[in-house]
Amino acid sequence: MDEEQIWRLCMLAGNQLLRYGAETSRIEETITHFAVSAGIQVEHVQCFVTPTGIFVSMSTAIGTTTRLERVTGSRILDLDKVTQINSLSRQLQSGECSINDAIDQLEQIDNAPLLYSLPVQILAAALSSGSFTIILGGKGTDFIYGAIGGILAQELTRWTVRFVPRFFAVLLASLVGSLFAVLISVLGFSHHEGVIIIGAILPLLPGLAVTNSIRDLLAGDLLAGVARGAEALFTAAAIAVAVALAISLST
C-alpha cells in the first residue's frame, strides 16, 4: 500500500475536521483511526493538533516519518460534515471501503454544499434573534426588529470575513446591528433598545468556541483549549466594543 496515500488521507481528514469545528481530541483520535485502519504497514501513530496546525508522526516497517500541515483559510461550522468524516473512519476500520475510496469521499464531503442553505441560515438567525427579544421582555414589534438586526449582523459577518480578520468582521457586524437597534429607538418605533441590541448580536456570540475550549481543557489539551478560549474572548471583546460604541453615539 502506498504510504503517501495514507499520509494524504490523514492530513485531508484532519484539515477538514479542524476547519469544520471539531474539538481537538476528536481530530487526533480520528487521524489515528484513519492511519491505523489504512493498512498493516502502520505500527504506531502520534498526533498533535493545534487550532492552526496538525503534527503527525507515523512509524512503519521502514522507519518513522513526521509531517506537519498548517491549516489556514476560512472556517465554517458544519457539524454534519464532522459526523460524516467520523462515520467514514469507522467504515475504513471495518473494511467497508478502501483507502482510495476514503480519499474520494473526503474530497466529496469537502466540496459538498452546506447542509443548510443560505435562506435556511437567514431564517434561523431571524428566529433566534427575534425570539430572544421576546424572552427578555420585548413586544411583538421588537421580535421583528431583533430578527432584522440578527440577519444584518450574521450576513455582514459572512461577507466581510472573506476580506478582513474575523475580529474586525465581528466588530463591524456588531456595530451595524447595534446601530440599527439605536436607530429604531431614536425614531420612536421601540423603547426596548437594549433588548433589540441583544437579539441582533446573538448570532455572533462565540458559543461553540467556548464549548470546544472547555472540552479541550478538560481533555488535557491545554494549548488548544487556551487558544480557543482566547479566540472566544477576543470575539466577545469585539462585540462589547461595538455595542458600547453604538450606545455612546446615540447619547
Question: Which positions does each model-derived feature cover?
Answer:
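Alpha-helical transmembrane segments and their cytosolic membrane-interface
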Residues: 74-142, 228-239, 251
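Core alpha-helical transmembrane segments of integral membrane proteins
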Residues: 114-187, 191-192
